[in-house]
Amino acid sequence: MKKTADVIIIGGGINGCATAYYLAKRGIKDVLVLEADDSIGHGGSSRNGGGVRQSGRDVRELPYAMYAVNNMWPTLSEELGVDVEYYQRGNLRLGKTKAHLKKLETLASNARSVGLDMHVIDGKEVKEICPHLSDEVIGASWCPTDGHANPMKTTLAFYTRSLELGARYITGAKVKAIEKVKGKARKVILTTGEVFEGETIILAAGYESRFIARTVGIDVPMTKFFEECLVTEMQPHMFDIMLGTADADFYGHQSQHGSFVFGSDSGLEESIDKSFDDLRTTSITASAGCRAIMGYIPKLADAKIVRTWGGWCDLCFDGVPVIDRVDEVPGLILACGFTGHGFGTAPAVGLMLSQMVAGEDTIVDISSLSYDRFKSLK
């Protein structure tokens, strides 16, 4: 087995796979992806609700989120040769109170400041877009260019195409440390003792990135968060849009197969004591999510849940990721802390990381996502 590569990517989630694809596409084919699990995309990449959204994001994320929606997602299925089930039908973020609408107006105003078409509409307009919602909904933010896609199919499509273009993957390769050689990040050491060497190392391992980065003196202030989703039995067609709420207590959409896919939040996830290897869902989140869903979509009150799943997300302390070369450790690029909403931006992130490796300017300015922003915390 070859133990060297031009680029080593730690993490075989959607960001790692997308980066491998765009690197190989531009001719950098000596790319090695190390994935700790026995399967690709086993973490949050395949365990989210599939939102491809711009609305509700921090303004620091919007430029590349908008780039992905405008320039990448519409042709991604054709490019990767797989139907990733991308639908651009819009996103309603629902509100039931004046406080909700105030929060939504702030989000919409911030989004418009960087050019996103997002505005707040009243209850009548909401019902015109989605008549199946509760009469308690008095308004919503509306972003017509948001959508959704299939996370697993998208992740595996990037994986398959990158393989075809020459990238290599090793699963079951749990990274213990990065080691510097003459001041530069060069070696990746597995828990088995195996050592791989690369000219550039990209750290995209979700929450575990924090522990790996510490081995070269870098600390990204992240915590972990257990994300849970559920799927209902097939229902008559109701809508194609993406839904969320002002309080972010659930989000989801109806799939092309008729089932609904929802992610939900009990508000108590941080108090749930689970090991990182424990992916079992919790009754508290499922019940809280179902109550929220029924409160907004009464017609789903009798729908049966056929499947649930959970996965860990990496929550950065200020809510946006780190995508940056690290000055203190030449040769190391961080791509972590996506805070539960990295799926929709993955094509743009993969492209930008490939540009960083090639020494090019990125498609948009991401200086606000630099590692340097944490230095004031020390």
Residue ranges and their predicted role:
Residues 2-15, 32:
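Beta1/beta-strand and adjacent pyrophosphate-binding region of the FAD-binding site
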Residues 24-45:
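Glycine-rich FAD pyrophosphate-binding loop
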Residues 49-129, 249-251, 277, 293:
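Dinucleotide-binding Rossmann-like beta1-alpha1 core, especially the glycine-rich loop
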Residues 64, 93-103, 142-160, 278-285:
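Short beta-strand to alpha-helix junction loop
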Residues 141-192, 196-199:
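Helical element adjacent to the flavin cofactor pocket in flavoenzyme catalytic cores
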Residues 194-239:
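Central helical "cap/lid" subdomain
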Residues 234-331:
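Active-site lid/adjacent beta-loop-alpha segment flanking the redox-cofactor pocket in flavoenzymes
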Residues 291-378:
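C-terminal catalytic lobe of FAD-dependent flavoproteins
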